[in-house]
Amino acid sequence: MNSLLILNSRRIRTVQFRIYLTILGLLFSVAASAQADEASRRRNFNTENGVAMREFDAVSYFSGRPVKGNSKFYHNYKGITYYFANAANLEEFKKSPDKYEPAYGGWCAYTVALNGERIKINPVTYKIIDGKLHLFYSFNSDNRLLKWNKDEQKLKAGANRNWMARMH
């Protein structure tokens, strides 16, 4: 009887140890996945000196007047650093960063739509579509937003498809 209790006690400890190892493995897996997602975002997002959107304040676009951010008000979201013009915009971004983060990693939406290519943007050439910020290249007479506006639905579908392929 005593040896039966010892045997059952060992089995229980073995099962507990296996459960512990499984949980530990899952935790490491989740952490590794999160790091991989951040690394992918850093590789694929449009940043200069580690800062997105050419240092423009993502929240300011939604008030209709994009302004440059200040390094004093910054936030790192999933590996991407954003600057904000003031503390209020910083706090607003923190509440719902996915709302304010630009589409297609902050690259020119028109070019992502055409062929998945990533080119820099002019931070004051933008359009908010379905509540999402889209940025565009614009220099001299080459304004990609004007081209986008000619066939927005088709281009948006192409940009979504190309961006998803790049991120996965």
Q: What annotation goes with each model-predicted range?
A:
Residues 1-16:
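N-terminal secretory signal peptides that target proteins for export/translocation
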Residues 13, 29-34, 157:
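N-terminal cationic amphipathic segment used for targeting or macromolecule association
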Residues 20-29:
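Bacterial N-terminal signal peptides
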Residues 35-168:
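Charged, low-complexity intrinsically disordered segments
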